[in-house]
Swiss-Prot record:
Listed cofactors: pyridoxal 5'-phosphate
Modification N6-(pyridoxal phosphate)lysine occurs at: 259
Gene: hemL
Enzyme class, broadest EC rank: isomerase
Location of this chain's protein in the cell: Cytoplasm
SUBUNIT field: Homodimer.
Source superkingdom: Bacteria
Protein name: Glutamate-1-semialdehyde 2,1-aminomutase
Pathway: Porphyrin-containing compound metabolism; protoporphyrin-IX biosynthesis; 5-aminolevulinate from L-glutamyl-tRNA(Glu): step 2/2
GO molecular function: glutamate-1-semialdehyde 2,1-aminomutase activity; pyridoxal phosphate binding; transaminase activity
Main location: cytoplasm
GO biological process: protoporphyrinogen IX biosynthetic process
Keywords in alphabetical order: Cytoplasm, Isomerase, Porphyrin biosynthesis, Pyridoxal phosphate
Catalytic activity field: (S)-4-amino-5-oxopentanoate = 5-aminolevulinate
Record organism: Thermosipho melanesiensis (strain DSM 12029 / CIP 104789 / BI429)
């Protein structure tokens, strides 16, 4: 199937990580999925810790979501007009995400971030933006940059086709480095339109913020009249019903959302203070539009997902308990191999470098070959991890204690076989 796919699609995939290139395997092709499990086209079944990269917090094909999609599909799949689900979703987001007073739906996290940055530039009438190395905010040109050689180095393209001139307005800072971001603002503060950050980094593995890191960003952006944007595409409704901003009690000016709020269908949203959001067209001069924005199928899936979460008071407690059990089990099983597990709620990643991992430099020092061995071994025993050492595992509401224990048991077998030279 992969060879055929490569005839018609670049690299045989529609998103690079799906190619399994980082783990040096051909990708699996999914036939079906239910709950915590997926089945490939050869009828092999796996416990799935990808869960559509965190979008499926209820698990695959949850009855509530499927019923909502089926019901809406009978009423229409797309209108290009206003409909009640848009208002219902907006109200849920405003009532639960502390920073959001008004919100606009879009079709992806990339689109949400792109629009939020345009809005921040319009509001501040400044051009420069600050992002952090290791944080991913979609594939818009201004954010496809790497750090360069110095703390204050302006961005250089990290993708062919992105011009140096375009990303010259992007400053790349060091994640979790308070001194570095202070220096950036001392030098460029009056030029900075916004700072965008994953409040919990989730695209270089899971890297939680150090104490006072987010608060420092909040204080600096207020001092210099810049906009603070939290990219909560992963963390929104994942780590708490109030997102990471509620978890850490640091409230940004704008927030981007995605994944969970779409119930597994394509989605994005950005929102924030009314004063800022009222600049968006048609109310204001900042243009943003989308044919499928607020799509009724997506919002049916999303609203049903969020209602399920909000109506189950022990929802996050269950996820946390499952994730904690997995964290402790992996630490014990792989304790002889320099493993470090990072976890926030139901987001987990592990690194093989024997030390705490709280910066981009420490992330990339992890033993990627060890991860490849682990991935291949787990896959052979029906456990599907992310096919990259720098992505998060996600626990869903559908995962069971049995799933977690089976995963830990396989980790124990891997450890034993590795010691005996059988892996």
């Amino acid at each position: 199937m992969f060879e055929k796919a490569k005839e018609f699609m670049p690299g045989g995939v529609n998103s690079p990580v799906r190619a399994f290139k980082s783990v040096e395997l051909d990708p699996i092709f999914v036939k079906s999925a239910k709950g915590s499990k997926i089945k490939d086209i050869n009828n092999n079944e796996y416990i799935d810790y990808i869960q559509s990269w965190g979008a499926l917090i209820l698990g695959h094909s949850h009855e509530v979501v499927i019923n909502a999609i089926n019901e809406q599909s009978q009423k229409g799949t797309s209108y290009g007009l206003c409909h009640p689900l848009e208002v219902e979703m907006a109200q849920i987001l405003v009532e639960n995400i502390p920073s959001i007073e008004m919100v606009r739906m879009v079709n992806s996290g990339t689109e949400a971030v792109m629009s939020a940055i345009r809005l921040a530039r319009a509001y501040t009438k400044r051009d420069f933006i600050v992002k952090f190395e290791g944080c991913y905010h979609g594939h818009s040109d201004s954010l496809l940059v790497k750090a360069g050689s110095g703390a204050l180095t302006f961005g250089t393209p990290n993708s062919e086709g992105v011009t140096k001139e375009f990303v010259s307005k992007t400053i790349v800072a060091k994640y979790n480095d308070v001194q570095n971001i202070n220096e950036i603002f001392e030098n460029f503060g009056d030029k900075i339109a916004c700072v965008i950050v994953e409040p919990i980094a989730g695209n270089m593995g899971v890297v939680p913020p150090k104490p006072n890191f987010l608060l420092t960003l909040r204080k600096l952006t207020k001092k210099y009249n810049s906009i603070l944007i939290f990219d909560e595409v992963i963390t929104g409704f994942r780590v708490s019903q109030n997102g990471a901003q509620g978890l850490f009690n640091v409230i940004p000016d704008l927030t981007t959302l995605g994944k969970v709020i779409g119930g597994g269908l394509p989605v994005g949203a950005f929102g924030g203070k009314k004063e800022i959001m009222q600049l968006i067209s048609p109310q204001g001069p900042v243009y943003q539009a989308g044919t499928l924005s607020g799509n009724p199928l997506t919002l049916a899936a999303g609203v049903s997902t969020l209602k399920f979460i909000l109506n189950n008071k022990n929802f996050y407690k269950k996820l946390d308990e499952l994730a904690k059990t997995l964290e402790e089990g992996l630490l014990y099983a792989l304790k002889d191999f320099n493993i470090k597990v990072n976890r926030v709620g139901s987001m987990i990643s592990f690194f093989f470098n024997g030390s705490s991992v709280d910066t981009y430099e420490k992330v990339i020092s992890s033993d990627v070959n060890m991860y490849k061995k682990l991935f291949k071994y787990f896959l052979s025993y029906g456990i599907l991890l992310p096919p990259s050492p720098f992505e998060s595992l996600f626990i869903s509401y559908a995962h069971t204690n049995e799933d977690i224990q089976q995963t830990i048991d396989i980790a124990m077998k891997f450890s034993k076989n590795l010691k005996e030279g059988k892996v």
